[in-house]
């Protein structure tokens, strides 16, 4: 979490609490919230990396006022719908089968997304 927050409050206009309040207000206004849209580690920016940062981002979305299920949707079905990716973002016949099996219940405790037991990509279980 500290690493994800590392970029906030580093500029005169940076304000982490304002960022959380903005996400909350946008969500309350019905604006689709998309998770994972700014992982820019490959450009040398501190604070984010593809994959692992998403778990922290989900925690921050919950901290901003989204329910855990809404945060999970922000990383799955909402981006798929927003970008017209009909083959992903939900569990349904014919959809791309990229899944995580976790210990716990991330719909009530978002940090449980970090307790990954198994991973499937395109319907095939990956080697651990």
Which residues make up each language-model segment?
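His/Asp/Glu-enriched, well-ordered alpha-helical/loop segment
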Residues: 17-102
């Amino acid at each position: 979490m500290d690493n994800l927050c590392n970029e906030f409050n580093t500029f005169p206009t940076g304000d982490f609490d304002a960022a959380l309040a903005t996400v909350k207000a946008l969500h309350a206004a019905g604006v689709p919230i998309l998770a994972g849209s700014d992982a820019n580690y490959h450009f040398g920016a501190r604070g984010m990396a593809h994959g692992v940062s998403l778990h922290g981002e989900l925690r921050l979305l919950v901290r901003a006022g989204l329910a855990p299920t809404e945060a999970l949707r922000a990383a799955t079905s909402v981006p798929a719908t927003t970008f017209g990716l009909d083959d992903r973002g939900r569990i349904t016949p014919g959809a791309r089968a990229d899944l995580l099996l976790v210990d716990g219940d991330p719909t009530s405790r978002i940090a449980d997304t970090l307790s990954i037991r198994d991973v499937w990509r395109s319907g095939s279980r990956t080697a651990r």
